[in-house]
């Protein structure tokens, strides 16, 4: 009889301890949008430094994607590399090396820049990727001059659900046109 009570007490204590455990997800997901348009293509080397830094800070189980902002209609083909790192640290390090190798080719792929810059389309794609990962902390980094250039056919008045996603613009450069009309 004592052993039954002892077993019940241990089971009750174990269930109470499990109920008090931290239920948050601690994985991170980062989506980096790199502007490769004509006005910003010269900054790509700095973008590679950002990628290298992020690879050093991400942990096993985290997710990372890098996409170029170049076309007027952002799509899956603009994603250069994406990965969810393995829980095994050795395998995660190997995945980081492969990821870095994929992104090193970015500078060679960009020749002269593009005529259009669909930042809003990139944000929509990034939010979709981040929400699919199920990560606890989601961040979109925009490496751009923030000059969105769309043709008259491209419509971007769609609602964006960015709930739970941090959006940070980095290395934003001042353009000559900013002095002409600062509201842009």
Describe these PLM feature segments:
Residues 1-9:
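Bacterial N-terminal signal peptides that target proteins for export
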Residues 16-19:
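C-terminal motif of bacterial Sec signal peptides marking the signal peptidase cleavage site
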Residues 21-23:
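Bacterial signal peptide processing site
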Residues 26-137, 139-143, 172-175:
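Von Willebrand factor
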Residues 35-43, 105-116, 178-183:
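Second-shell loop/turn segments in exported
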Residues 47-53, 125, 150-156:
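N-terminal post-signal-peptidase region of extra-cytosolic proteins
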Residues 147-184:
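VWA/integrin I-like adhesion module and closely mimicked acidic/polar interface patches used
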């Amino acid at each position: 009889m004592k052993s039954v009570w002892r077993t019940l007490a241990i089971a009750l204590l174990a269930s109470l301890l499990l109920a008090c455990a931290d239920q948050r997800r601690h994985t991170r997901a980062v989506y980096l949008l790199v502007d490769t348009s004509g006005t910003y293509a010269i900054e790509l080397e700095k973008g590679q430094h950002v990628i290298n830094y992020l690879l050093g800070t991400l942990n096993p189980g985290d997710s990372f994607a890098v996409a170029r902002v170049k076309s007027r209609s952002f799509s899956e083909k603009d994603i250069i590399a994406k990965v969810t790192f393995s829980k095994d640290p050795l395998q995660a390090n190997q995945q980081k090396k492969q990821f870095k190798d994929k992104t090193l080719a970015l500078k060679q792929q960009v020749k002269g820049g593009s005529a259009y810059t669909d930042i809003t389309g990139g944000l929509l794609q990034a939010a979709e990727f981040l929400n699919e990962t199920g990560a606890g902390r989601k961040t979109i980094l925009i490496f751009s001059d923030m000059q969105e250039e769309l043709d008259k056919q491209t419509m971007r008045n769609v609602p964006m659900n960015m709930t739970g996603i941090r959006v940070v613009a980095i290395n934003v450069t001042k353009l000559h046109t900013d002095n002409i009309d600062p509201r842009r």
